[in-house]
Structure formats: C-alpha cells, structure tokens
C-alpha cells in the first residue's frame, strides 16, 4: 500500500515513521511536515535525520503550510523535548 505521512515529528511520529518504513506492506512515497509538537523546520529536520538513520533517505520530505508566530507549547516541550525527540541528536 502506498502511503504519505503527515508528521510533526516528535517522539510519537518517530515511531510511526519507523513502523511505516519497516512494514513490508507499506510503500512510503513521501512525508509532509507540519507544526505541532515542534516547528515545521524542526520536524522536517527530525524526519530527514530519521529517514537517513533508518536507511530510507530517498523518501521525499515536503514542508506543509507554516503559520506565522507559531511557538511550541511548554507542555509539548516537556513531553517531547525542545527538539521533539527528547533532546536526542538523531544525526549523531
């Protein structure tokens, strides 16, 4: 099944992305980035780093619509960390 994921890649979406890549019945044809747990820019950076880590760097990542003045809520930052993935440096 072809799939496009729309993510604000925090911890929860990192698991969804890994599952989609690992599932033999899913053909991940793209990811769009949105805001929520993190900004679009941070989410896209997280997504691209995870795709590389998981051996799927060829999956295209597209930015969704940004919203002016969006800031990550304190609750999201406490749950997901400022970078959305618990302050883990995925690229390391």
From Swiss-Prot:
Pfam families the UniProt entry points to: IU_nuc_hydro
Any one Gene Ontology molecular-function term assigned to this protein's record: hydrolase activity, hydrolyzing N-glycosyl compounds
InterPro entries in the record: Inosine/uridine_hydrolase_dom, IUN_hydrolase, Ribo_hydro-like
Stated family: Belongs to the IUNH family.
PANTHER family assigned: SI:CH211-201H21.5, SI:CH211-201H21.5-RELATED
Protein name: Uncharacterized protein in ribF 3'region
Organism annotation: Corynebacterium ammoniagenes (Brevibacterium ammoniagenes)
């Amino acid at each position: 099944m072809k799939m496009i994921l729309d993510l604000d890649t925090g911890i929860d979406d990192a698991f969804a992305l890994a599952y989609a890549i690992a599932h033999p019945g899913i053909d991940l044809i793209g990811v769009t980035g949105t805001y929520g747990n993190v900004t679009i820019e941070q989410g896209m950076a997280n997504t691209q780093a995870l795709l590389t880590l998981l051996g799927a760097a060829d999956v295209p990542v597209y930015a969704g619509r940004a919203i002016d003045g969006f800031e990550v809520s304190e609750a999201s930052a406490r749950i997901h960390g400022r970078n959305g993935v618990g302050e883990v440096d995925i690229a390391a």
